[in-house]
Regions:
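Expand to "…catalyze enediolate/carbanion chemistry for C-C bond making/breaking, isomerization
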Residues: 24-334
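Short, positively charged and aromatic/hydrophobic N-terminal segments
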Residues: 15, 21-24
Length: 334
């Protein structure tokens, strides 16, 4: 958990954290919040301090631009980065199919609090919380955003993404993910951070991630249990195209929705791996058409080309085709 949170006016984060248990219990009795389908194949991290990178980000074909105020900004440059980001958002051209999110600093230091104030000026699609270790890390910021008047006509204002990059975060995965299932919880996505996790645990960085695979799958399962999206960690060697493609394929097979990226050259590989091939789209259309046929009305199981297909496969096919629609819409608006 983040340490003691500094006092700031409107709203008081310390007070919000203190009443967290009561708020959490109240939320669990509310109606689950609906998380609409979004494209998150490629999440490119852009240092908020880098003016050239900020300008270039608008021209790139990534689904999500993550403006980073944390690891990629030196402590003495934090204030400058916040000011640059607020100025960038003031002229940002937003369009359907792309999200703009901001990763803040931890709230156990002064920069995290100041970052949240900047969030109110920027109003991104989401706030990315680093090193989330327990549910209260999410709930405190969710309450702060509501109390600060961050709700707007885009449903309920900025959502939250939780970075799972600590041993404690892994141990508390289910409780963290559960905060996203209810009204006001704001949590929309889990993001794996392996660099910090490897540093804390000592797990070896080996190609294929054999010792990390069980932990990665835990994050996927927790996200799916509570209707959240889930994004795989960065691939550090952006010069290794084959290694990136292999890790993107692995992530897709594990069930991730997309991948964190650190360089524009990684975008195409992520979009391809987490996209939909023509063969996949054709198969999905065949499944949907089979269940829509009059002779199959009311059936829970049908046969397609000698293969038994259940209704759950039709649901999966429908979601895949909805993803195709989103991809095509993005192409039309960019």
């Amino acid at each position: 958990m983040w340490g003691p949170i500094l006092f700031i006016a409107r709203p008081n984060l310390w007070a919000l954290a203190a009443c967290g248990k009561a708020r959490h219990k109240e939320r669990m009795n509310r109606t689950p919040h609906h998380h609409p389908l979004r494209l998150r194949r490629s999440v490119l991290s852009v240092p908020a301090i880098n003016a050239k990178a900020l300008a270039k980000s608008a021209t790139l074909d990534c689904d999500v631009v993550l403006f980073d105020l944390e690891d990629s900004v030196l402590p003495e440059k934090k204030a400058e980065a916040r000011a640059a980001l607020v100025a960038h958002f003031a002229t940002l051209d937003r369009y359907p199919g792309r999200e703009h999110v901001i990763r803040i600093n931890p709230l156990d230091g002064p920069d995290g609090v100041l970052d949240l104030k900047a969030v109110l000026d920027c109003m991104p699609d989401a706030v990315v919380l680093p090193k989330v270790s327990e549910p209260q890390d999410v709930l405190t910021v969710a309450d702060w955003l509501s109390e600060a008047g961050a709700d707007d006509d885009r449903d309920f204002g900025p959502r939250l993404w939780a970075m799972i990059e600590t041993a404690a975060g892994l141990l508390n995965l289910a409780a963290i993910a559960e905060t996203g299932r209810t009204e006001g919880g704001r949590l929309d996505c889990l993001v794996v951070g392996l660099n910090d996790l490897r540093k804390e645990t000592g797990i070896a960085d080996i190609p294929g991630r054999p010792y990390l695979a069980p932990l990665l799958l835990q994050v996927v399962v927790a996200a799916r249990a509570f209707g959240l999206d889930v994004v795989d960690a960065v691939f550090n060697n952006f010069a290794d195209a084959e290694g990136l493609e292999a890790e993107c394929r692995q992530g897709r097979q594990m069930g991730f929705d997309g991948k964190m990226l650190i360089h524009p050259t990684q975008i195409d590989a992520a979009n391809a791996a987490y996209g939909v091939t023509e063969a996949e789209a054709a198969e999905a259309l065949a499944v949907v058409a089979a269940f829509a046929a009059p002779e199959n009305a009311g059936k829970a199981v049908v046969t397609i080309a000698g293969r038994m297909v259940e209704k759950l496969h039709a649901d999966q096919a429908g979601r895949l085709l909805a993803k195709v629609d989103l991809i095509n819409e993005r192409k039309r608006t960019t």
